[in-house]
Amino acid sequence: MKELFTLGDLYVSDFLKEDESPRHLPTELKLLLDDNGAVRLEKQPPLDTMWGRYWYRSGTNLTMRKELSDIVSSITNILKLKDNELWIDIAANDGTLLSYVPSNLIKIGIDPADDSFKKESEKHADLIIQNYFNADEFKKSK
């Protein structure tokens, strides 16, 4: 690996309440070039510092709702899914994409964000897994 440059010590995105101090220390973001030509971070910040508290909701923006609806339409036109097949939405957010998935499919949403999304996304899914996506977590949910 070859070091490209560092962006320095930066705070990872966090959505602070008024008069609240940052919950985490800054993290150095150093970029490396691997043998395949891919740019990578030297160290990944802890995931929960990036995704534990996340404010953006897909359903509040007409442009995003249209985009997500079009994604579902494109996929269902290509794949011709059968009854009870699984549709898994990784980073399901507030469940907006799942709201466009046909009801004859089993809809599973996975997202690590705090409880602020779960109530909304549960309206559109058969199951919401509030964690990071991995095979073990998925198997536990069956």
Protein language model regions, located:
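N-terminal juxtadomain amphipathic helix
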Residues: 1-62
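Conserved SAM-binding motif I beta-strand of class I
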Residues: 106-111
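Conserved alpha-helix/loop element of class I SAM-dependent methyltransferases that forms part
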Residues: 65-84
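Conserved class I S-adenosyl-L-methionine
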Residues: 82-93
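Conserved SAM-binding strand-loop segment of SAM-dependent methyltransferases
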Residues: 122-138
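Conserved SAM/SAH-binding beta-strand->alpha-helix loop
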Residues: 113-115
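Conserved SAM-binding loop of SAM-dependent methyltransferases across substrates and taxa
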Residues: 94-104
